[in-house]
A protein has these predicted regions:
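Polyanion-binding surfaces on beta-sheet-dominated domains and ring/shell assemblies
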Residues: 1-244
Length: 244
């Protein structure tokens, strides 16, 4: 990244966006007929699939909870998802870390007490990686859970921010992630602004933390507006098709 200008003197990023702009967000729900719920999301060039199965009987009886559902999450990356073409074994450290982060995020948001002694499986896969993988997975999983009819406290919306050359950049891409600058990934419940995931990848001066946290919250709310509009349109189209 040496010598590469992330932000121009005119205030534009390499992809033409302003510092506080989201990448283009594309959503589709109901992409798998075999799953109880599914979704596909593009955040810029990062492309993600999510599928939800359940609630169903707990596969490992020893893990069953008498008062709530068990949330199982599995993250993977397609072998062609990055330019590195690096083979990532199932269950490698990074995949397990992301799986656990997504699991904990949704355990705090899904109304698990509605489904005692049952299991809900969330599978997410990165098809193409270009930055913001955590956020893309969380946003896709949210849509898939809504498609499955799983009740939640609210949408879970996520966005990543970086702090480069004294500027906070919203919804970072791969080149911006590769700058070694501090990066914050945030997921919130938009209506209450409750934080359900916060990851800071490197040290950041306390004076700058509030600035990037505020921008990340703004990004999450912008994502929420887009997801909510898509869910509304999807429900409207589904109802129309049932009536014809």
């Amino acid at each position: 990244m040496a010598g590469l200008e992330i932000l121009s003197p005119e205030g534009f990023r390499l992809d033409g966006r302003r510092p506080n702009e989201l990448r283009r967000l594309v959503c589709r729900m109901g992409v798998f007929t075999q799953a109880d719920g599914s979704a596909y999301i593009e955040m810029g060039n990062t492309k993600t699939l999510a599928a939800v199965y359940g609630p169903h009987e707990v596969l490992n009886k020893a893990k069953a909870r008498h008062d709530q559902a068990l949330i199982n999450c599995e993250f993977s990356m397609a072998t062609f998802s990055t330019t590195e073409r690096k083979t990532r074994a199932k269950g490698d450290r990074k995949s397990v870390e992301i799986s656990m982060a997504i699991k904990r995020t949704f355990e705090s948001c899904i109304l698990t007490s509605n489904y005692p002694r049952s299991q809900i499986d969330i599978f997410v896969q990165i098809l193409q990686a270009d930055g913001g993988n955590y956020s893309a997975c969380i946003n896709a999983a949210t849509l898939a859970l809504l498609d499955a009819g799983i009740p939640m406290k609210d949408y879970v919306c996520s966005c990543a921010v970086s702090f480069i050359n004294e500027s906070a950049l919203l919804d970072i891409n791969y080149l911006e992630e590769s700058s070694s600058a501090p990066q914050l990934t945030l997921a919130i419940l938009p209506k209450s602004e409750k934080i359900v995931l916060l990851r800071l990848d490197s040290k950041l001066h306390a004076d700058n933390l509030e600035k990037i946290l505020d921008l990340a919250k703004k990004g999450c709310k912008d994502v929420y507006a887009l997801l909510r509009r898509h869910v509304h349109d999807f429900a409207k189209d589904s109802l129309a098709s049932m009536c014809t």
